[in-house]
């Protein structure tokens, strides 16, 4: 049997081909280290699989920062994260890397970031209005379209990696530790993203995926927000995850996808997939979530949650969907990417008939200051933990 049918991204296919090698060749990247003594840890914010995260103070200017101390992993992976963060610095809604220092105790690298008030999306988004959801989804799309245009897939889009300062309506896409450069025809590791947000391509072991993986993950976030069901696809393991998806999208389209790309399904699926019809999105609407659902929301969701990665909306196409007409209209009127606090109700009657332009947000200002940790006393002291890691 011949192997899987190759696939290439529909957009930004060759951006890395047209850039100098040093842009994407992260293994050759030379890291410029800042001064660890500029930083003093204040409290622990959380821990992840690959890092521990602290709130800290840059003692040269008294500004709050966030310090991500990386756990011992391959130098190659650390260099990849640093190179990607440097390439994306200043992009819309991308967390700003301010400095890189070495933890004086473990000698492992520590990344210093701009501080964002620490409400993670997961805690916040079950309280959001219809307008809020549209607003923040649009802000995430700005970050995704930007990183994709720069030849980079995030590969770990999920609520935990979206930081929102709701008071100032400021959003940042964080944790670029799994992000990777897109090269057409390259086969990638499918062990990326978090289970509930893994695209079908990962679950069926199709390695020639692209930026569209991030759009599936975004669709999972949207579904959980508008239906108030967290997570929306709740698999108990990676095999069950595909079953949960098939119970909503149906098995017929799944097999069409498998056939189109000549994918060989793991035999373990034989006993668990079964046969399922495609469900209408309306069946997930009930009295508790109907205020968040609209025809345009369901149409938008339907265009993201597609088995075939090539059929999903791109980030730029998504920004032009009628679901965002009220946001585009307001941002054009305000001439700004940050709306004032408000939770304007949205009705289909308020939809514009078309979009003339999508405003480009101004880049984030540079962070004053430099690297990561001052530690003779601080690192040795117990640090109180806070809910919700920032990085």
Swiss-Prot record:
What biological-process GO terms show up in the record? Answer: double-strand break repair; positive regulation of aggrephagy; regulation of cell cycle; rhythmic process; Wnt signaling pathway
Catalytic reaction equation(s): L-seryl-[protein] + ATP = O-phospho-L-seryl-[protein] + ADP + H(+); L-threonyl-[protein] + ATP = O-phospho-L-threonyl-[protein] + ADP + H(+)
A Gene Ontology molecular function term for this protein is: ATP binding
- InterPro entries in the record: CK2_alpha (IPR045216), Kinase-like_dom_sf (IPR011009), Prot_kinase_dom (IPR000719), Protein_kinase_ATP_BS (IPR017441), Ser/Thr_kinase_AS (IPR008271)
Main location per UniProt? nucleus
Domain (Protein kinase) spans: 39-324
> Where in the cell is the protein located?
Nucleus
Which residues constitute the catalytic centre? 156
Q: Which GO cellular component terms, listed alphabetically, does the Swiss-Prot or TrEMBL entry include?
A: cytosol; nucleus; protein kinase CK2 complex
* TM region positions: none
Recorded hits in Pfam families, A to Z, give: Pkinase
Which intervals of the chain are annotated as region Interaction with beta subunit? 36-41
Function as written in the Swiss-Prot or TrEMBL entry: Catalytic subunit of a constitutively active serine/threonine-protein kinase complex that phosphorylates a large number of substrates containing acidic residues C-terminal to the phosphorylated serine or threonine. Regulates numerous cellular processes, such as cell cycle progression, apoptosis and transcription, as well as viral infection. May act as a regulatory node which integrates and coordinates numerous signals leading to an appropriate cellular response.
Q: Which family does it belong to?
A: Belongs to the protein kinase superfamily. Ser/Thr protein kinase family. CK2 subfamily.
Instruction: Report quaternary structure and partners.
Output: Tetramer composed of an alpha chain, an alpha' and two beta chains. Interacts with RNPS1.
What's the name of the protein? Casein kinase II subunit alpha
Organism field = Gallus gallus
């Amino acid at each position: 049997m011949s192997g899987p049918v190759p696939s290439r991204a529909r957009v930004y296919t060759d951006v890395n081909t047209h850039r100098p090698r040093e842009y994407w060749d992260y293994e050759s990247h030379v890291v410029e280290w800042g001064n660890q003594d500029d930083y003093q840890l204040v409290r622990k914010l959380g821990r992840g699989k690959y890092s521990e995260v602290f709130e800290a103070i840059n003692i040269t200017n008294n500004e709050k920062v966030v310090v991500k101390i990386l756990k011992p992993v391959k130098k190659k992976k650390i260099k990849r994260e640093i190179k990607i963060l440097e390439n994306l610095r200043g992009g819309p809604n991308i967390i700003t890397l301010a400095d890189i220092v070495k933890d004086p105790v473990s000698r492992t690298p520590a990344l210093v970031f701009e501080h964002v008030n620490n409400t993670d999306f997961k805690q916040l988004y079950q309280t959001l209005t219809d307008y809020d959801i549209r607003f923040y989804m649009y802000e995430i799309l700005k970050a995704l379209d930007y990183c994709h245009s720069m030849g980079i897939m995030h590969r770990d889009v999920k609520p935990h990696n979206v930081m929102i300062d709701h008071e100032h309506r400021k959003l940042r896409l964080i944790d670029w530790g799994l992000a990777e450069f897109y090269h057409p025809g390259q086969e990638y590791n499918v062990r990326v993203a978090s289970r509930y947000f893994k695209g079908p391509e990962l679950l069926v072991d199709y390695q020639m995926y692209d930026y569209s993986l991030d759009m599936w993950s975004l669709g999972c976030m949207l579904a959980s927000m508008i239906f108030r069901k967290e997570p929306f696809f709740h698999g108990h393991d990676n095999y069950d995850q595909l079953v949960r998806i098939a119970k909503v999208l149906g098995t017929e389209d799944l097999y069409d996808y498998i056939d189109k790309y000549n994918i060989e399904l793991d035999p373990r699926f034989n006993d668990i997939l079964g046969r399922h019809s495609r469900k209408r999105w309306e069946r997930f609407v009930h009295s508790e979530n109907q205020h968040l659902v609209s025809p345009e929301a369901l149409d938008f969701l339907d265009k993201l949650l597609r088995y075939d990665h090539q059929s999903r909306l791109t980030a730029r196409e998504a920004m032009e969907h009628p679901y965002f007409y009220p946001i585009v209209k307001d941002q054009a009127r305000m001439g700004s990417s940050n709306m004032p606090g408000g939770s304007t109700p949205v009705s289909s009657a308020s939809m514009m008939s078309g979009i003339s332009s999508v405003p480009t947000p101004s880049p984030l200002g540079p962070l004053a200051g430099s690297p990561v940790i001052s530690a003779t006393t601080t690192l040795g002291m117990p640090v109180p933990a806070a809910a919700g890691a920032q990085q």
